Each structure stands twice: as structure tokens, then as C-alpha cells.
């Protein structure tokens, strides 16, 4: 039986030790967190001096890769040059913080929403994202950046595999960029994971390469195929359903990757229960 690296997106309140205790409470072996406020510029109270010890402890406890989530406010594709510059500088700072974890032996990625072109057009948006990442990697290359598959709402870039491939092809340091596969977003974007799982995986492999997928956001979908809504549902309570998640956790290529739950906490034990549910689906 394959052991899943799985957990949820956790609060950093209380610092590194409190973060790990929350993971223990839900029975996780991987998790995500925001390195600073997800909606604003204020940094969270994570002591850089404690990062290395945190990484060493995770490594000793056998954790899978961390999938840290960059703040939503970052928009590498935006019209405003000052905001793009902020995103570049802040993302580089986040990577520097996380590099200490990686250097302690614990694998860690930082996941970003690629960005929204806000009316400039997809081609311009994808180019700006690539250029922004190139500037980030001129400053630091300590941690791989993962581009998240998007649902396609508004003017999001990365709404299909080809757009993500375009962004990645524009990055000079290709070893530093990969993909996070969000199950809700992929279905909402129009890929039929329920009835054509193998076909979707072939499309992903042809456009990007399965080897470039480094993490999974494990979410059910409220609205489903082609809705472009980006509304997560709890596992088994949406349009993807338990048969899809059974297929996912028994797919040798995907099941070895860190899986991060971003579902709503309906009760204090929601994520603990969902982690147990997904582990119970493994053959």
C-alpha cells in the first residue's frame, strides 16, 4: 500500500512549533501555509532564525514536501508595474525564508497563482509572468516555484495546460519552475476528470509533462465541469466524487506527490477526517 503525503493548509499563528503541532493534530504528513498575509503586504510572524530547525524536525519526522502558498495579492501579470515589482520582490523574500528549510534537508516548494492579465490579453499576461519569474530567479533559486492550474475565472492566466506551458517555456531557469495540479480548478477549467481521467492525464503529459507536476491541491468542486467558478467542495461532496479520488490516490504517478486539502473546515475534525478518508481509499 502506498503511503500518501497529505495534509491541509494550516495557520502559522504561534510560529513554527505551533504550525507543526497543528499538522500532528490532523494526522498529516505534508501541509501548506502562507509565508505572510495572503491579502496584504504585512509579513507574518515567522522567525527566519527558526526555519532551519523547523526543516530539520520535519525531515526527521518523515514529512513529505511542503507546498507553501504565496499570497493571493501577488500578480505577476498585472498592468501596474509597481505591483508587479512588489510581487517579484516579495516572492524572492519568501523563497529566501524557505531556502533555510530546504537546506536543512526538507523539500519545500512555493505555489503561486500565475496571475491575471486584467484586460491586457493572455499573451501579454503569460509573457509578464515569465519575465517576472526570471527576475525572481536572478535574485534567488533556493526553492522551486509551482504554477497552479487555474479554473479560468475572470482574466486568469494558466486556465489550461497550454497556457502554463507557455509561461514555463518563457522561464530561463526551467529547473526552478513546476506545476501544482488543483483537482477542482482542472475540472472547472473544462477537463473531464470524472469520465476521462486517462485522457486528461495524457493532455497534461503532452502539454507540460507529468514529471513537471510536483504537488496536488485536493479539492472537490461545487459547480463542476467547465464552470470556471473555482468553488471548492469537501471531499466526496462535490462534482468530482469519491470514484475520482479513489482513482487519484491509486495512480502511482500522482499518489507519490504531496496532497494539500483546501476544503472548508465544517467541524474541528474536518481535515483529519478527510485525510483518513483519502488514506482509506488506497488499495
Curated annotation (Swiss-Prot):
One of its GO terms (molecular function) is phosphoric diester hydrolase activity. Binds 3 Zn(2+) ions. It catalyses: Endonucleolytic cleavage to 5'-phosphooligonucleotide end-products. This is Probable endonuclease 4. It is an enzyme of class 3 (hydrolase). Its EC number is 3.1.21.2. The keyword Zinc applies. Keywords: DNA damage, DNA repair, Endonuclease, Hydrolase, Metal-binding, Nuclease, Zinc. Zn(2+) 3 binds at residues 185, 230, 232. Pfam families: AP_endonuc_2. Its cofactor is Zn(2+). Zn(2+) 1 binds at residues 69, 113, 148. One of its GO terms (biological process) is base-excision repair. Zn(2+) 2 binds at residues 148, 182, 217, 262. Belongs to the AP endonuclease 2 family. It comes from the Bacteria. SUPFAM superfamilies: Xylose isomerase-like. It comes from Bifidobacterium longum (strain DJO10A). PANTHER family: APURINIC-APYRIMIDINIC ENDONUCLEASE, ENDONUCLEASE IV ENDODEOXYRIBONUCLEASE IV. Endonuclease IV plays a role in DNA repair. It cleaves phosphodiester bonds at apurinic or apyrimidinic (AP) sites, generating a 3'-hydroxyl group and a 5'-terminal sugar phosphate.
